[in-house]
């Protein structure tokens, strides 16, 4: 809501800075909590519902902008965009109260008033036994960075984050505003791009449900988004002056949003038998790594000055998509290798730090692998 009172760009920058600090735990924290409650055959759908709800907010936001612009622009001498932030803030307040009072935490420490003692016991029995809480120390950090989990999943999400660039950087909207031959209205600029998150919602729920049904084969989404990135970019490069191609490809690119639910569910699945603290670090690092790269990637390849064709960005998308397919294959190989080791050693959950070497069987590098 404070954005509604902003008078200069620096005000918005300061507000966004503090907003990022306070909301940084929301996305990864929710995926961590979901991974604490649900099994491999359930997690995808729950993660999908969570991420799809965010996409629904983006889609509905476009229609809200159109309505506010047409009915409230100038009301009480405030521009429509200021009313938008006021209304968004009012919508958010009850959600914050709801989360503060009813967020369930994890099965072993939940105080949710809507769960009975028997339901809490059932929740605990459904998920693997975890080790004692490991204190944050140099030993723990060394353990985190000596596992393949951290490197492979962080890079996976960095690549995945950039395959979302068409949608996350609003390229369709920028294309409409900078169309070489046609002038689109404000309503059209707001409404037409809502098809992108709509496709994202359908794709997210489809892939989340399918990978659950197939026993957690989340890697399929990695190949899907790789194919999507290559084909959509190639067709836009081949037909730069076709409005139909641009609309179709940008809508199709919205399906890449499916990686949010499935890749974080994938990390939760693979780390299910490791320490919760390690799982938390890996999941948080995935999002941190993606944001760190995206901070300059978007400017370098998808800046507004490259509109309407974003030729440089199309080539970048093809390169990232090829890398995504290769990295997905490598991660699958590491996952299968780790699962075979667990079967041989009989390790089904992580042991306590310092009480044995078994905890490193699942995720640690051999000396040869470090090289």
Give the residues covered by each predicted segment:
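Cytoplasmic membrane-interface "Motif A"-like loop-to-helix N-cap segments
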Residues: 212-227, 274-275
């Amino acid at each position: 809501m404070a954005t509604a009172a902003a008078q200069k760009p620096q005000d918005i920058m300061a507000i966004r800075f503090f907003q990022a600090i306070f909301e940084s735990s929301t996305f990864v924290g929710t995926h961590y909590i979901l991974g604490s409650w649900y099994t491999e055959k359930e997690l995808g759908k729950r993660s999908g519902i969570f991420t799809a709800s965010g996409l629904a907010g983006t889609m509905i936001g476009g229609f809200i902008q159109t309505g506010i612009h047409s009915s409230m622009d100038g009301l009480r001498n405030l521009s429509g965009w200021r009313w938008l932030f006021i209304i968004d803030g009012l919508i958010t307040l009850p959600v914050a109260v709801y989360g503060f009072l009813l967020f369930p935490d994890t099965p072993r420490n939940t105080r949710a008033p809507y769960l009975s003692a028997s339901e809490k016991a059932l929740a605990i029995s459904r998920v693997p036994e975890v080790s004692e809480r490991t204190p944050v120390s140099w030993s723990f950090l060394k353990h985190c960075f000596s596992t393949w989990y951290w490197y492979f999943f962080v890079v996976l999400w960095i690549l995945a984050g950039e395959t979302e660039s068409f949608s996350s950087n609003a390229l369709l909207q920028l294309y409409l505003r900078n169309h070489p031959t046609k002038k689109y209205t404000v309503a059209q600029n707001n409404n037409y791009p809502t098809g992108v998150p709509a496709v994202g919602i359908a794709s997210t729920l489809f892939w989340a449900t399918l990978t659950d049904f197939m026993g957690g084969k989340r890697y399929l989404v990695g190949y899907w988004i790789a194919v999507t990135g290559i084909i959509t970019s190639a067709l836009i490069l081949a037909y730069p002056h076709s409005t139909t191609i641009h609309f179709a490809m940008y809508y199709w690119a919205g399906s890449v949003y499916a990686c949010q639910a499935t890749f974080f569910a994938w990390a939760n699945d693979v780390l299910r038998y490791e320490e919760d603290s390690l799982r938390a670090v890996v999941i948080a690092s995935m999002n941190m790594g993606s944001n760190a790269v995206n901070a300059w990637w978007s400017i370098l390849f998808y800046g507004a000055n490259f509109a309407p064709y974003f030729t440089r960005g199309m080539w970048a998308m093809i390169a990232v998509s090829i890398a995504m397919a290769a990295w997905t294959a490598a991660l699958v190989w590491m996952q299968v290798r780790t699962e075979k080791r667990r079967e041989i050693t009989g390790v089904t959950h992580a042991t306590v730090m310092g009480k044995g070497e078994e905890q490193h069987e699942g995720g640690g590098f051999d000396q040869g692998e470090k090289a």
